[in-house]
Amino acid sequence: MGRWIVAMAAACCGLLGVAGTASAASVPISGLVSKPIAQGGTCSTSPSATDAPAGAHRDYCVAFNLDTGSGAGQDDAKKITIGLPGGVVGDPGAAAKCTQADFEAGNCADTAQVGTVSSTVTVVVPIFLFIPTQMTVTGEVYNLQTSPGEPARLGISLDQGLAGALSPVHLQSPIRVRVADAGLDSVTDNLPKTALGGSLHVDSMALTLWGWNQGDSSRKLAKPFMTLPTRCDADAVSNITVTSYGGQSTSASTSFRPTACDKVPFTPSLEVGPTTTPADTPGEAWAKLIVPGTDTGTGANARRQAYLKDVDLKLPAGLALNAPLANGLVPCTPEQFGFGEDAPPRCPANTEMGRVEFVTPIFPGETLTGKVYFGEPRPGVPLVNYISVEDPRLRLKLGGYATIDPETTAITAHFTDQPQVPFTSFRFIYTDPGDGRATLTSPVGCGDYSVTADMRPWNGGAVQSPTNAFKVIDCVPPTFQPELGASLPDTQAGGPAALTVHIGRPDKNLRLESAKVSLPPGLTGRLPAVPACDVAAARANQCSDASLVGSAKVSVGTGPAPLSLPGKVYLTKGFDGAIAGLAVAVNTKVPALDLGTVVVMNKLMLRPDTGIDVQTEALPQKLEGIPTPYRSIDLTIDRAGFMQNATSCAANPLHGTFTAVGGTTANADAPYQATGCDKLAFTPKLKATIGSAGQVAANSHPPLTVTIEQPDHQAAQQRTVVSLPAGIGVDLKNLSSVCTDAQLNAGACPAGSKIGTVTAQTPLLPAALSGGVYLMQGAKLGALPGIALDLGIIRLKGSVALGQRLVTTFDGIPDVPLSKLVLNLTGGPKAALKTSKNLCTQTPTVLAEYASHSGKTAKETVNALVSGCGVSAKSAGLAIKGKLSGVKKKRPVLSLTVTSAQTLKGLRLKLPSTLKLGSSKTLKRAGRVYLGGKRYKKTTVKWSRGKISFTAAKGAKTKKLQITLPRGVLRMKKAIKVGSKQTFTVYGVTTSGKLVSAKVRLKAGK
């Protein structure tokens, strides 16, 4: 906006006092008048009535009295500053301009005259015998050519007084614009105070600045000169300050109230540009406010257009704030801008974001220019503008701000309480530096877009809302081609991994709304290694660093230089069916923007192949109304001990599924392949227990427990084949109820198809997985049913074949480390397994063959533990007493006394899980056996199939055996609390070879 130059006459007279005698005193002011009067009216300290129709052209009267002289306490005026009200302006183009040289020579043409002056002076000069003599002098006010940096200059010419007794006085008064309110100040300095060898004192002055010719032939104005304010709801205040030669200042003020504001016209218009712009592109944008420069009406009824007070420039939805604007942009502080200071702003260069062009009638044919600076944002107001018209003749400093509709992203720029200054054109331009940092980015869709300016005048009239439109062109066909990338600094199979996933969206593609990245099986995280953050805390950005697993970098915006924002990635607890989550907390704070920390939640979904799907929630498409078109998302998961590589070295890519705003989908892959599989160990171990009391004889249905354990950081199993002991088959009549694939996938297998339970432990999950074991429908009619392990989110299916042994094969096991898998098949009359011979008459063996994802294989033959051989302890009359001591010092001692109703020839002892054998040598050397109360030294003592076995020499037999295992024979596998009960299983071997079993619980002693 521009500031108007008021044509101001400084009634600066030839002045005061007797040189050398005046004291340092102030100069009192009285009778101040500053107001419009009717043409032909009297301008004095007692003027004609006020005639102040708003926006009209009226003569303007400034009059005042000064109390100067040579008396005690009086001083001469050195400087007079007259400040006219804001909105009282003069048009320097209304009259010709007289050169300063011609003015001093008294040669100004009447076409340069813009007013008259009258002054009453008192002279004390020799020609009047130093008798104070009062006289009235008159003169003219001229429009002068300016000096550099001045908007206007007035020349006040006082004619000769007393028939030539006084020489003409020529005073020049430069005009300056007040930065605070754009009002005009007339400043006259170094005023004369002597005349004709004596002193000259000004008693009063009256200055008339013409409004318009209005039929007065003595006036030669080319157009109206003075114009009144267009505001009627407040007084128009004038101020005068007189400074004496002694440095003392006196001020006075007066006011008038304009009238008839309802008669003031206001018919603005609007232009916007560029008139055409390519779609979805950052670039220059401008709006031009236009106010007619011609009057409405003629003569005394002529009115200037009302001054603009407020404007709300409403941009269409789609023309949005461009996030990359914040790249390198910093705010200018109010102190740096210098509101109210008549000096250029001190804002840094990287605060500039636009320019202004200002056309005012004061400078015909000229366009004043200035800059738009980025001001300090306020809460809820991310875009603040400081505007400076940077012309030394007319310096304007204005403030504006923008509000953004949080739903539509439409921007409204607000400029309020603008100074009362006339302009015909004010063009506000958001520039484009050419590097993608333009303030605005164009709409995505082609078509016409309207801009509206709600313009409110100072006269209190109706808001005018001119509109204009621009056209968006060059729309590309809807394209959605997102990119997916993955990088790892170390791809050692089974080793620690630091994974960076990159999602890219080319410019002008459809906006990305969500993404799902499917990691290949084996490339996964160890959830127990990191304490998970609560979901509510994560959404509130309150996760601690204990849950931190990586970092993020998100870039948003259109054009060649999107805005890059940093972030952190936290592991969270599971939600909405996910086993866990990732909270990506992006910090939006940069010097030019602070929308807080934005948290986007991601679900970690476990697939049936044990791979992880990372599924984002819907990405926010705008923040406080600022669009966030995602250009790239980089997530780096590098917490030590969290991620690990797959144990398969086959190429297995990451797969991305992306959804655009509007529903369009696209896919992309990123290559991944682990290396060094040959370096991985592969040593799975199997244990098996079969049978129970009453279910070991031929044609019985024994339960079966198979446990497979494997150390961590080894290759994962890909194929496992287990061959059960000879003599164990299936009972076909118990295989009638089976589960179909559809039922299994739905978790709805018939109850009759369940044959057991399964539990799996993996270092990847904080808790074990468990579920049922089911008979599956055979691959073809007449085939044996298959078997399925239903662990809920993981389901493994195996095949069953019957030859010399019953063989179960699990193929295609996912690449996931299993530290322990326990399979329990139920025994009993309806069980699937059936014996063809007594299990207690042999040593059953289980054959196991393994193949790993790394390519390594392993096999083993394991003796199965048979449970339930022999009669029960109660029916055999087996009684056991014993004592366990020494656990406090971790040197356990065990003594047992076994009494049987049947004759025994040996004993087997199964230890609890808390104890183990120290060594076989110590057992043989230190273990003591008593038969019938006497120590027996011919006993064979050995460790076999997880049991301590005591066998007497051939022919020896007894119904009572005592065993003592002193310190050193047994060792503790883990701590045993004093007073806890430990369970031992005792098997008595009868002379017929049958086993009599019983369990005893012994209280652990010190």
Model features per residue range: what roles?
Residues 1-4:
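Positively charged n-region of N-terminal signal peptides that target proteins for export
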Residues 7-17:
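Bacterial N-terminal signal peptides
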Residues 24-1006:
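Ser/Thr/Pro/Gly-rich, low-complexity intrinsically disordered stalk/linker tracts of secreted
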Residues 19-21:
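N-terminal signal peptide c-region/cleavage motif recognized by signal peptidases
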